[in-house]
Structure formats: structure tokens, C-alpha cells
Amino acid sequence: MLYPTPIAKLIESFTKLPGIGIKTATRLAFYTIGMSDEDVNNFAKNLLAAKRELTYCSVCGNLTDDDPCNICTDESRDRSTVLVVEDSKDVSAMEKIQEYHGLYHVLHGLISPMNGIGPDDINLKSLLTRLRDNSDIHEVIIATNATADGEATAMYISRVLKPAGITVTRLARGLAVGSDIEYADEVTLLRAIENRTEL
């Protein structure tokens, strides 16, 4: 069906979001049009504020509105351990279990030879620099997803860090192969941390 241009543009904008197909985008567009002006203005204001005010922590790469982020500046955290994750959503998932008290490093992606993504295309150099410049870090826990790309990334990091004498561990296999950390329940994540294995 042909919609007026403003609706068609709104539908097109919604389809750019991950997991949103044309039907859902159409439903969201019509719902948005039915919202009050105040709600639409607040939605737009919050969307712009999130885009403009958030940045990546210069230490760990996590999304933050302060740089460095509140995790990196929290003196009560265990500074001997760094948990390496794919993206900021994984940091949130791990923080929910309230059992990990170390630091994080966000890669912003995974090594994916099939997609032409190599080690230089993710936030890996800053991890290596961070480890080189900080002798307090003794263990790196790799918490990438249990996918082919997650495994490739974990193995690469392990190979690079082993000569430096840093203990490199991997989350235990409470996580199903192909599963995403952000969707795992808290008990599964807790068991995966507790039973991590050395690489």
C-alpha cells in the first residue's frame, strides 16, 4: 500500500533498526503518529540526547556519559581482572548478576574472517596497550559469544596474550553454542564465570 510521504519515511527509518521488518515498522510508525505531541517530542529529545551525550570510555570502550566510565573509576573494583566482551550490552548483562567485580574491555565487534573483519577492525589494540601499561592486571576473562566468530576472537586474544604471562580464561560452557551473552539468564552467567577455563 502506498502511504503519504511522511509515514513512508518514518516506516523506512524504523526498518533500519535491527530485527524490525516492514510490518513491525509500519505498526510502530502508526503508533507513533497516534501518540501525543508531548510524547513524540520527549521520544525525539531522548533519542537525540542518547546519540549526542553518550561516548565510549577511553579506558574500556563501554558506553558512558562520563569519561572514563563509572566502572573504570570505581576504586572498589578488582583491578587484577579484565572481562573482555563484544559490546556494551554484554557489560550490562554481566553487571546484572552482581558477582563479577573486576574491570571490562569492550571490543565493539568480533574477528570475522568470513566478513573481512580482522583484529585491527575491533577495539583490540587498546586492550593490548592497557595490559602492557598496567601491571596490576593478571587475568583476562574472555566472554565473547559462543559462535564461530566469538571462538575465533577468543583464540586470537589467547594467542596474543599468552607470551605476556597473563592468565587467559574463557567463560564456561553453561552458554549454549551460538547463544548471545546479553540474552543469557543470570544463573547461567554466574555459573559461566565461576567455572571459567584457562585457554
Curated annotation (Swiss-Prot):
It comes from Streptococcus mutans serotype c (strain ATCC 700610 / UA159). Disulfide bonds: none annotated. The lineage of its organism: Bacteria, Bacillati, Bacillota, Bacilli, Lactobacillales. May play a role in DNA repair. It seems to be involved in an RecBC-independent recombinational process of DNA repair. It may act with RecF and RecO. It comes from the Bacteria. SMART domains: TOPRIM (SM00493). Keywords: DNA damage, DNA recombination, DNA repair, Metal-binding, Zinc, Zinc-finger. This is Recombination protein RecR. SUPFAM superfamilies: Recombination protein RecR.
